[in-house]
């Protein structure tokens, strides 16, 4: 793969026509045609055959900025939700008085706080010249793009019929938010990227251990090192947050470190169970990715909250601590749910899913016929 530049005035290049889109209609997309187009050598970006690296670098930056844009968009949506919930009265009360509305507002606020925290970590990596932030950027992009979509959906739901019609702005927010889960790499692909990067190192380590077990007397060092790391992992003594935390945050740190250990051991079990077929076990990889995303978000939230406490004092950080508490609890619940679905028993359910999908493919759609309903 080779990267190169194309100018609109180059012979053989043509814009076929613009594309009419569901949302983001303020920007123009078009179909492009290349016919017998010759690219001069000085139009190359990097060396021949090195275009993939250029693409990855561009995508990393794009995922970072897209996550930032989604976070800003979610803040604006939450502002509109808060305003509407106070103004709209039902049953003698503003919508903001009802617990279901409060759950919507609080979840979105805590997720904004988490997304902002992840972006802070990412920005610091960029500022210090760290070029390898592809995993963190992918995590932030997936998290933020799904957050902004949920917020847009909740805004439309909160507004009721007004959310579905013009001239109210809510239907446009929904339309404009949808593309973010596709831009800069579809979220399904990014989840596989996150998970496969996560299993690569453990898989290599397990291969080394497997080779060492064939000649144990010659490889005592490797085996003992691996055994020690596994024991520490079981005890939750690896991947700790090496920062001093206020007492209000320590419970979150303890759960975080426990969950990191559980993710590591769960990854090992999956590799042992599936071996080379792990790359095709997309549902299991998707769960691993979601666990990793929630762990990255949790670590970012804890670190940011402690930084604010250090800077401003505990007395002025009650709202931020509440956001931290809420996000860590809900992220922990999602983590444990996904961890439970890594069990071999879930594979039976996954097999059923594959079977039903096969029936859909064979029937070219819904496949159940019922004589009573057809009459």
Where are these regions (language model features)?
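FAD-binding core of flavoproteins
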Residues: 1-75, 90, 182, 186-269, ...
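A generic secondary-structure signal for well-formed alpha-helical elements
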Residues: 8, 78-89, 112-129, 148-151, ...
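A broadly tuned preference for mixed-charge, low-complexity surface segments
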Residues: 15-31, 78-79, 85-86, 91-96, ...
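A residue-level detector for conformationally permissive "hinge/kink" positions
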Residues: 15-18, 43, 54, 84, ...
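Alpha-helix capping/hinge segments and adjacent helical runs
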Residues: 24, 131-229, 233, 319, ...
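Glycine-rich cofactor-pocket loops
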Residues: 45-65, 78-110, 120-138, 162-167, ...
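Alpha-helical transition-metal enzyme core signature, strongest for iron centers
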Residues: 71, 75-78, 105-119, 144-155, ...
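C-terminal amphipathic alpha-helical interaction region
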Residues: 221-375
């Amino acid at each position: 793969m080779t990267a190169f530049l194309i100018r609109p005035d180059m012979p053989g290049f043509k814009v076929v026509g613009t594309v009419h889109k569901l949302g983001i209609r303020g920007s123009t997309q078009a179909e492009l045609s290349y016919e017998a187009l010759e690219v001069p050598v000085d139009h190359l970006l990097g060396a021949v055959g090195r275009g993939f690296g250029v693409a990855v670098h561009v995508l990393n930056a794009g995922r970072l900025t897209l996550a930032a844009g989604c976070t800003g968009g979610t803040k604006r949506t939450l502002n509109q939700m808060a305003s509407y919930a106070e103004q709209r009265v039902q049953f003698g009360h503003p919508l903001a008085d009802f617990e279901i509305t409060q759950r919507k507002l609080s979840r979105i606020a805590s997720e904004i706080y988490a997304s902002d925290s992840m972006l802070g970590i990412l920005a610091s990596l960029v500022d210090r010249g760290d070029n390898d932030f592809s995993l963190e950027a992918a995590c932030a992009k997936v998290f933020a793009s799904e957050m902004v979509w949920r917020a847009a959906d909740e805004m439309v739901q909160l507004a009721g019929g007004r959310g579905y019609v013009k001239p109210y702005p809510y239907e446009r927010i929904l339309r404009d938010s949808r593309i973010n889960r596709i831009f800069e790499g579809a979220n399904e692909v990014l989840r596989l990227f996150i998970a496969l990067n996560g299993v690569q190192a453990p898989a290599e380590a397990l291969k080394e251990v497997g080779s060492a077990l064939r000649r144990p007397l010659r490889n005592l060092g490797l085996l003992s090192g691996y055994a020690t790391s596994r024991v520490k992992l079981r005890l939750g003594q690896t991947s700790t947050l090496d920062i001093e935390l206020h007492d209000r945050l320590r419970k979150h740190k303890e759960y975080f470190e426990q969950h990191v250990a559980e993710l590591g051991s769960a990854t090992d079990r999956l590799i042992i169970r599936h071996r080379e077929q792990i790359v095709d076990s997309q549902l299991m990889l998707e769960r691993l990715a979601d666990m990793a995303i929630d762990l990255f978000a949790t670590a970012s939230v804890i670190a940011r909250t402690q930084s604010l406490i250090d800077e401003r004092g505990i007395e002025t950080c009650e709202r931020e601590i509440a956001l931290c508490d809420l996000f860590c609890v809900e992220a922990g619940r999602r983590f444990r749910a996904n961890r439970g679905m890594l069990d071999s028993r879930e594979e039976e359910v996954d097999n059923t899913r594959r079977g039903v999908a096969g029936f859909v493919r064979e029937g070219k759609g819904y496949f159940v016929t019922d004589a009573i309903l057809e009459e």
